[in-house]
Amino acid sequence: MKKLIRKIASAAIGISMVAVASQAMAQDSSKPIVIPTHNWSSQVVMAYVIGGIFESMGSNVEYVPADSQAVYESIRNGDVTISHEVWQGTFGKSFYNAMAKGGVIDAGTHAAATLEELGVPHYVIENNLCPGLPNWEALKNCPEIFATADSGGKGRVLEGPQSWHGELMPNRFKALGLDSNYVIKFAGSADAIWAELASAKKEGRGIITFNWSPNFTDADGFDFIEFPEYTDGCRIADGGDGACGSPKGWLKKAANYKFPKTHPAAYTTFSKMSFTTKDIGQMAALVDIDKMSHEDAAKKWLADNENVWKSFTQIGR
């Protein structure tokens, strides 16, 4: 009987030691979590929001500027830890290509649905500057409404930075027979798009520009042009002719495959993060409308929305 008791006691001690060891192994690493920053406001503010959440949990954080397409290779190689705004339409292919090579994992999907498309400020439609909009065929009859000093008499279409979509929009306009009356110009940054939108609004002139939702413009009055419906394979890169619009899509999160092991608590929190259209629009508006710095915008958003983000940190709930 005494031997049995000793065996049970020894087993209990062993289990306790394993449990303690497991807890020690489960401690998040002191190695910094590397968060990338790109070139649009919500992404940068959210980087600092997420970094602030990680820091509140005791993690160390480092921010690095990164190319929005190449970042998935950086995650795969371990140079960057996460990506928190993986837009399906623009970055989905790069994301899945990196996953297929190994080293990148899908860390979940935000509540917000996305759309990345060309459009016009609402006053363009309200004032009937180009009758028939938002139907794309209206563009055939009013290129002069969108002409600028540098467009050679053609209508100008202001695309995002070329690194975002490459030749997607030029290919679309050619496939739809609009290229003879319109020229595609690439903006240097998201800020350049907002500056052009503000200038056009002040002057009351027509402007076609790339935009996306969720964004601060959701509440500011912006209408997306209704191009032919997107179908799988319609884009040139997928074997089609390019005569289609953009799909509505998801907004995902990506992480290096080692993140769950090196920072189990931070990864669990990251996997639970799910921001809404309203959340993301607020983050962008603090910079693009209220003119705050990205860092200050993140601090304000965190202070104003503790009820949102603290739930992400409650492990096991």
Feature-to-residue mapping (PLM):
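Ligand-binding pocket segment of bilobal, Venus flytrap-like solute-binding proteins
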Residues: 80-84, 158-236
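Short helix-initiation/N-cap motifs at beta->coil->alpha
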Residues: 40-41, 59-76, 184-196
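A conserved helix-loop-strand patch within extracytoplasmic ligand-binding domains
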Residues: 103-158
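A bilobed periplasmic-binding-protein/Venus flytrap-type ligand-binding module shared by bacterial periplasmic
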Residues: 116-128, 248-262, 285-286
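Short, well-ordered beta-strand elements
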Residues: 28-42, 59-64, 154-158, 270
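Immediate post-signal peptide segment of exported/extracytoplasmic ligand-binding proteins
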Residues: 24-34, 54-55, 146-154, 308-317
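C-terminal functional modules
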Residues: 267-317
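Pocket-flanking alpha-helical
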Residues: 47, 66-102, 196, 216-221
